[in-house]
């Protein structure tokens, strides 16, 4: 058994570095959206109207079903919520 260390859980469980990076970005966005909804005490129905999605879709978001959301969808919802997204790109070590 190897004692390999990973910088992120996504590095450990995803098959490729590309998939891991995608999941890292998606998890940051999903968490930001969940925090926004919790902080504003907005109902799922209200959020659905703002995000332009269905209430069950917001429920999936709140339950952390990350596999159901692509980057585009999460970016669109965050922007609709008035959140500003910044991205930083670094060269691999």
Q: What does each model-found stretch correspond to?
A:
Residues 37-39:
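Short amphipathic helical patch at the helix-1/turn junction of helix-turn-helix
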Residues 71-87:
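DNA major-groove recognition helix of helix-turn-helix/homeodomain DNA-binding modules
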